[in-house]
Amino acid sequence: MNAEGAGKLQTRFRRVVKPVSNRLWHFDLEGFDRLPESGPAILCPNHVSFLDSAFLMLHVPRNISFVGKAEYMDSWKTKFIFPAMGMIPIDRGGGDKSQAALDTAERVLRRGELFGIFPEGTRSRDGFLYKGRTGAARLAMKVGCPIFPVGVIGTREIQPPDAKMPKIRKDCTIKIGRPIKVERYRDRADDHRVLRQITDELMFEIRELTGQDYRNVYAGKSADAEPLPVAARVAHVGDEQQMIHEMAGAAAS
C-alpha cells in the first residue's frame, strides 16, 4: 500500500496529541513563519531520533508526507496507520521500489503539499551530521519548489538510539532555516554537479541550525572518518573544479 499524501489522520493526530506532548516536553520553535501557507515545499531535517518526524508533524501547521523505511510496514496495523499519517514507504535497497516512492513524493508536491525527507538517508546514531544525498535537490528541481533546511535539537536526548521509551521533561528545539531556491539552476536540472552543490548548501544550513559536527561520508559508511567543517566544503561551491573534485571521491547517491 503506497501513501499518496498526508490525510485527515495526521490532522487529528496533531489536534489530539499536540496538547499532550506540550505537557511532556518543552518545545522551542524558531523560523516557522518562513514556511509558506500554501504551495509545495520540501522540508529537510537532520535525523537523530525516531521522534524527529513525529515532532515536526505535531508543530508544522500543514500536513507533511514523509519518507519512511518500508520495514516499518510489517504488520496490518502499520500498513494502514503509517500511510494514513502520510508516510511514503521506501525500499532502501534501491531499484524500482525506491523510484516508486520518489514518484509518489513528486505527485504530493505537484498537488501543492509539503514533503519531508531526511537528506542523510538514515538516523545518525552518534549525533554527527552526515553527508546529504541528492534526492531532495532532484525533486526540487523537477517540481520547482523551495527546500527548507530544518534543525531538530534535543530528540536524541529524549529518545537515544535503541531506547524503547522516550524520556519526559526534556527540551526540544526545532528551527526552520531560510529556503533554498533552485530556480537559478533549472536549466541544469540533469547536472549531478548542481544537485551535489544544492545538497551541500542544504547540509551547511542544517549544520548552522543544529551546531552538529559534520562528517564527509554517508551515514553508515564509516564511523571513523574525521569530522570536517561544512564551511570548508561549501565555501567555494561556485567553483566548478571544486565540485568535480568532490564528486570524484563521492559514492553514487
Regions of interest found by a model, annotated:
Residues 22-30, 97-99, 156-159:
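Short gly/ser/thr-rich secondary-structure transition/capping motifs
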Residues 33-35, 106-107:
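Short amphipathic alpha-helix with an adjacent loop that forms part of the alpha/beta core around
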Residues 20-22, 81-82, 108, 139-140:
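A generic structural signal for well-ordered alpha-helical segments
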Residues 1-9, 99-253:
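Non-catalytic C-terminal accessory region of glycerolipid acyltransferases
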Residues 1-23:
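Extreme N-terminal tail/first-helix region
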Residues 29, 66, 87-89, 147, ...:
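Conserved beta-strand scaffold positions in the cores of enzyme catalytic domains, especially
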Residues 15, 22-23, 35-97:
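Catalytic core of membrane glycerolipid acyltransferases/transacylases, capturing the structured
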Residues 32, 46, 69, 93, ...:
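Generic beta-structure capping elements
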